[in-house]
Amino acid sequence: MCRLFGMSGGAHRVRATFWLLEAPDSLAAQSRREPDGTGVGCFDEHGRPLVYKQPLAAYEDKEFAQEARELCSRTFIAHIRYASTGAIAPQNTHPFEQHDRLFAHNGVIEDLPALERELGEQLSLVHGDTDSERYFALITREIERGGDIGRGIISAVEWVAEHLPVFAVNFV
């Protein structure tokens, strides 16, 4: 099972070093059981998304350790991967970025051909082979259709629940 991390510093730019590297249950420590990829995403001082990821376990990834110590942001998303769908490769490592939003997912969504048919031209947002990135593309499409983030998320989750075999749709 993948592991998710999300943190908001509110109005303040903060570091996530403790939770990513130093805590007894840090993502680096948990990656010994979830070794298939590590990523961290945040936003720079101008609100632009930044994503750093490798198809390596966090405890082995020197760049992850450096990023965890140096990055300062109001919002962090991090993910360690236990691959269920898609190869162990950079393009399948979370978090993903679409239209200036970041996304990481824990769970399994099946019947990807049905999801791809539903996505239509939005499938062009997908660069890897994971169910997660396709799920994010559906959320992105629904947000763009209605212009409301909350309603877009609800609409996408409802479509997935109604049409696809799902084991979990947890995401940050």
Ranges and model annotations:
Residues 2, 101-111:
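Conserved beta-strand-loop-short alpha-helix elements that form
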Residues 13, 69, 122, 144, ...:
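Small-residue-biased structural context
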Residues 146-172:
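Catalytic core of PPM/PP2C metal-dependent serine/threonine phosphatase domains
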Residues 24, 55-66, 78-100, 117-121:
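Short acidic (Asp/Glu) patches
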Residues 40, 107, 135, 171:
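Residue-level signal for inorganic ion chemistry
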Residues 1-57, 76:
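Extreme N-terminus nucleophile/cap motif
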Residues 7-10, 79-82, 106:
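Fold-independent oxyanion-binding glycine-rich loops
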Residues 116-142:
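Long, charge-dense
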